């Protein structure tokens, strides 16, 4: 029975990854600016951010030391020996690796690095091997530009063309950085990712009652079944991501279950799993919990498994790293056997030598020579002298139309551009520049296509071939008319991007611009664009104000129009009162036995005063203790909330010591207002939210008292308050 596991992997939050990237970039930038990694100014205050900045700063320091060592090796023939300074060891290592590459080039040896070089050493070795050669269509070796030339590699393409197996990070430096997903470690070459064996590297990832089984990218904690099956669920894990065993009745979270009474004394041996009252075989091959290498095939057995060596057919070759079998194509004169190309002995299988000749087998071919000739290949006996003399094969026309060069015991044909001489087959063969000089023939933004005697470079979409036939130049779609952007076009390497003017957003087709309705977006957000009304326009918006208001220079604020200042009320018997959004003309109307204080003795703003005048015979008038009636007119906006009291009116009584004044609010309603007293001043305040349009009238009784508390005078203040429809 096969046991399947559901693997659940939790991804690290993108915001946290972006935070670490920002912190790392800060450390890199610190080294570039200061050339040190002390007193790093981190992008964040957390210990995690500071640690990331320190790591990336030291990485930049070591990369700089390696590059410095490479530069020294290009100019000098010896490397610095001071390895006790920070980065000194890596500087000398990269210098030695570059000198090794130069030695191989000087001896015309293949520039191939051995296994075991560090990532920095390998980069220096390859730079000194490949950075100074460039192959043209004619296969001539000339001096060219290195691969990190900004004209060859566009920054935007570097991750797309990198050899990172998992993740690539382009931080804008000289090179990109590779990293691996959770459960993998970066290989020494700095690009490949290898599985991390958590069962060996982590400290007790599983409990004592569980076996740790390594898997690709994670591990599994596999429970051992003891006498008592009940077991609190423990999640199987890949890295830190929990997963649950399917069809396992004892793997459900928070459950306890017991085996039947008939099986409570039953225990399963290693390689078996207790399930549904029985011990069932664990298929280690299907679970991937076996340790067979890539050169072996896992075969499940009852309670265990075995590893059988993989075998390939006679015409196949086994990859020593992956174990895969690939077909072998042998050249003429060879046949495949046991994964190798073996020479065909034409002298046995058949040849065309004459009667006076004998057949001599050669690698991949054969030759006919005079019988009894004891000379080596390429030589023949001189009948007169009895000595072996070189055979001038060029006189036999062996090279055809090509130039022939006779050599002791052999010959060589001088091949044309794009060809090379195969000494075993004695013929000129086409050079596949795309394979032999991979990465150095065409731009990284191009595909290399081999042709007979040459090669061609085919650029990727968005690029065009330069005049040298090898480099790819970016096509500016914005200026050539390829781009169909409605408003603005921005060229990027290999493509383009449409952008819109302010007030527009890019549509779904990526070319057309759609108007943004700013009024709808901001409506009801508490941060409206306009104080009054908002009207959307193409690419913008327009603010309007209600009647009685005017727009301010900022284009969004509304202020009240003071109609009274414009002389709207005419006549001395009227008082013009400006309200929010309007105005009122109040006729001066005093009660009986009161006359208008035309001299405005009490200096009432937005109102008037009426003074009592009685004849000596009018006892009723004389009995009225109210000496003065004040009329005030005020305006307030509609307010949904009030954080602190708002002053509406201020009444001043000009009475000094030893007299005192009391202010009392005579007001019936929802109690939106109150009056507070500061010495001889009464202040009317709005204390509760109020909505308009409406008019509120309140009365304030003013009593003047003597030092002994006797009321000496009565006065009244009648305040009419206009509440606006708007909150401004």
Swiss-Prot record:
KW Isomerase (keyword) present: no
GO molecular function, one term: peptidase activator activity
Sugar attachment sites: 624
Tissue: Expressed in head muscle cells, anterior and posterior intestinal cells. Isoform a: Expressed in male and hermaphrodite gonad, anterior and posterior intestine and pharyngeal basement membranes, body-wall muscle, GLR cells, uterine attachment and mechanosensory neurons. Isoform c: Expressed on ALM/PLM mechanosensory neuron attachments, in flexible tracks connecting the pharyngeal, body-wall-muscle basement membranes and in uterine attachments.
Domain EGF-like span(s) in chain numbering: 155-194, 195-280, 281-344, 343-389, 390-429, 430-473, 474-514, 515-559, 560-610
Phenotype of null mutants: Gonads have short and swollen arms. Pharyngeal defects. Movement is lethargic.
GO cellular component: basement membrane; extracellular region
Residues of the signal peptide: 1-17
Boundaries of every Anaphylatoxin-like domain copy: 23-64, 65-96, 97-129
Keywords for this protein: Basement membrane, Calcium, Developmental protein, Disulfide bond, EGF-like domain, Extracellular matrix, Glycoprotein, Repeat, Secreted, Signal
Effect recorded for residue 288 to E: In k201/tk51; slight defect in posterior DTC migration. In a let-2 (k196) mutant background, partially prevents anterior DTC migration
One Pfam family in the UniProt entry: EGF_CA
Disulfide bonds: 23-49, 24-56, 37-57, 66-94, 79-95, 97-121, 98-128, 111-129, 159-168, 164-178, 180-279, 285-298, 292-307, 347-359, 353-368, 375-388, 394-404, 399-413, 415-428, 434-448, 442-457, 459-472, 478-489, 485-498, 500-513, 519-534, 530-543, 545-558, 564-576, 569-585
Effect noted on mutating residue 290 to Y: In k206; No defect in DTC migration. In a let-2 (k196) mutant background, partially prevents anterior DTC migration
InterPro entries: Anaphylatoxin/fibulin, cEGF, EGF-like_Ca-bd_dom, EGF-like_dom, EGF-type_Asp/Asn_hydroxyl_site, EGF_Ca-bd_CS, Fibulin-1, Growth_fac_rcpt_cys_sf
GO BP, one annotated term: protein localization
PANTHER family according to UniProt: FIBRILLIN-1, PA14 DOMAIN-CONTAINING PROTEIN
Other comment: Although involved in the same pathway as gon-1 and mig-17, it is probably not cleaved by these metalloproteases.
Quaternary structure note: Homomultimerizes and interacts with various extracellular matrix components.
Function (record text): Incorporated into fibronectin-containing matrix fibers. Plays a role in cell adhesion and migration along protein fibers within the extracellular matrix (ECM). Important for certain developmental processes and contributes to the supramolecular organization of ECM architecture, in particular to those of basement membranes.
Family as reported in the entry's similarity comment: Belongs to the fibulin family.
Name of the protein: Fibulin-1
Organism: Caenorhabditis elegans
Name of the gene encoding the protein in the UniProt record: fbl-1
